[in-house]
């Protein structure tokens, strides 16, 4: 198991192609797969992909 379970918020920003401040704003949302370990915010790596898919599905439903 070489894949990390969690990634940093800046890494999530890089993967999503958004700014770090935007990623930190997402991390404060209840539906985003981020949580605190001590004072550090981390993102559940597998959950990030699922979150992106759910956002894409939601956009399709809204525009239909």
Kindly give the residue locations of the regions a language model identified:
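Nucleotide phosphate-binding site architecture
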Residues: 24, 33, 49
